[in-house]
Amino acid sequence: MITRPPIKQRLVSEQIRREIIEGQFAPGAQLPTRTELERRFAVSTITVQRALDRLAAEGFIHARGRRGTYVAENPPHLSRYGLVFAHHDSEARPWPRFWTALHNEAKRLEQSEPGREVTIFCDADPHGRSAEAQRLMRSVKAHRLAGLVFCFQPNWLSGTPALEESGVPRVAITHDSGLPGVTAIKLDTASLLDRALDVLAEQGRKRVAMVTVGSIYASAADRERFHAGLADRGMSTQPYWYQVLDVNRPQWARECLHLLMNDGQKHRPDGVIIANDNLVEHASAGLIAAGVRVPEDASIVAHGNFPWPTPSVLPVTRLGFDAREVLRVCFDSIDAQRRGEAVEPEAERWVKVKFENELDSADIRAG
């Protein structure tokens, strides 16, 4: 149970923290002595000590014995990024594989980029009903974060410190942010579709099926783009070859692909795009059940989140997004906002699609 510090202690720590955040005490700068702080705030030695202990625990300062107390070289408001997931990963509510890739690579990034620290929050309950959500709100209000990266559209957090606290840069990995002060980090799914179709065309495929989920390529505009891309390449499809599944029930991809590709069908696709990596494993099982030989009977292009692509027992061409690049774009955007660079109210930054063979094979992790 976390208790609130006494009022005077809290006021001292808040004021010193504010002065560090505003740059009155730069990273590495020495703070006034304890005696000077006692006089300035008209408080006791123990009150000053506990206020400084609190700031040290938060990562803002550190003591050097008799040499005094100094601002940390990498204080949290400049170096600690909050990576926010909507909920915990659980059997009842499993994470999409994209979130798992981001989570895994966030901690690795700390090791490869000294001076950057990632704090992970796995509950964004706007009502603060969990300890995790309360920790998020407290960290934001105390400016213990350089900025926030939301792995989802955070509109339900309107009215909470997570979106309303001033001076906190924010980005959201989303198709459309639509929120003032939140930069949208967008994955270039349009080029993913184009490059997938290019691969199938290069392999001589003419009849293409698409299997996707409700969050991507599921709108009427997406379907029109798919048909236009096929027409541009002299390819074709059928209305019932465009299947949209529930991302939370990926196991049904097995039956879907078995139905599409079994030898009882009069016409079968010779190219399949599996547009979400949560479906890949089950879709591959469906192709095997249908007796499809890959690549003799059909070519398969599968979405993946690198460097953690979904395993497949079939030879598939993978393309998708590198979680490391996504995180770097997010953190760089936060840094730009913190430097005061102009950011439009609904600014966007894009992450480009990559083929698996465009990455170093040594970077690929077992999914």
Descriptions of predicted regions:
Residues 151-192, 278, 304-316:
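Flexible loop/hinge segments that line or gate small-molecule binding clefts
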Residues 196-235, 345-362:
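An alpha-beta-alpha
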